[in-house]
Amino acid sequence: MSGQLERCEREWHELEGEFQELQETHRIYKQKLEELAALQTLCSSSISKQKKHLKDLKLTLQRCKRHASREEAELVQQMAANIKERQDVFFDMEAYLPKKNGLYLNLVLGNVNVTLLSNQAKFAYKDEYEKFKLYLTIILLLGAVACRFVLHYRVTDEVFNFLLVWYYCTLTIRESILISNGSRIKGWWVSHHYVSTFLSGVMLTWPNGPIYQKFRNQFLAFSIFQSCVQFLQYYYQRGCLYRLRALGERNHLDLTVEGFQSWMWRGLTFLLPFLFCGHFWQLYNAVTLFELSSHEECREWQVFVLAFTFLILFLGNFLTTLKVVHAKLQKNRGKTKQP
């Protein structure tokens, strides 16, 4: 037997030994996966049972509170606070357990498990989401500038509007996945992206004509301003979140948002004038479009729908920001009154 053939045979035996070890390791891996699935099922059912009992207990406490003495009322209040705290713990637990997707994710992805099991994977996905927002904000800013000052063609406007639709659709999907993994983004700042997706889609279908041309430059100027404000928000919010996480005051899955939240009060109040300016520009867009919808040359249904959508965006953004600012001022006023 030649030396080369002997060497091949020796390598094969070495590979055979490694393969046997690999098979054993893979067997253990599958066994651990089955154990993990069993533990996940056990935890999920236990949490559901606990939540049901806590819900019943909360209703009972509410009935008891009506006829309780002062001492009993304090006990009821303490127990209610403990229940609220326990519910927050369950929320954190469920972030590491498989769960049914919401309606939106089911429609887009189907019944696929999107739960990330490690903190490292969750944070990596959140970080990638933030980078996606930053890069697309810069691209949209450049696109809006190009369409406003250089490319005066309907086809380039359609490309820009299609990019907006794709951007907001992608944001809603990624945010839904992050919410499934324990991110606490909620309320209007989630709905805001669904409304923006709809608005961008209607803009995409608006045919070229005199009415479109009357609104085109105003919309592109608004898009430029909005992208600049979003870039500022991302840049400063990210630094603020990093500092608050280091102090243990924020969750590691908290996200930057296109608005104002209570945690931004320290260090980011300088953004408020820009935000309110953007909100009132949305109102200005709505008023302009309502006027254009009554123009004698207007035949497109998109004009009135866009006007109504811009009005919804203004009301949602303005009232939510105002609510946060008012609540924070009330809280600060309460602190100053305390001896």
Swiss-Prot record:
Record has Lyase as a keyword: no
Protein origin, superkingdom: Eukaryota
Location(s) in or outside the cell: Nucleus inner membrane
Coiled coil regions in record: 1-77
A single cellular component GO annotation: nuclear inner membrane
Membrane topology qualifier: Multi-pass membrane protein
Pfam families: TMEM120A-B
Keywords tagged on the record: Coiled coil, Membrane, Nucleus, Transmembrane, Transmembrane helix
Keyword Heme among record annotations: no
Transmembrane segments: 102-124, 132-152, 159-179, 187-207, 270-290, 302-322
Gene Ontology BP annotations: fat cell differentiation; protein heterooligomerization
PANTHER family in the cross-refs: TRANSMEMBRANE PROTEIN 120B, TRANSMEMBRANE PROTEIN INDUCED BY TUMOR NECROSIS FACTOR ALPHA
Subunit and interaction comment: Heterooligomer with TMEM120A.
Family recorded in the similarity comment: Belongs to the TMEM120 family.
Function in brief: Necessary for efficient adipogenesis. Does not show ion channel activity.
UniProt name for this protein: Transmembrane protein 120B
Organism: Homo sapiens (Human)
Designated gene of the protein: TMEM120B
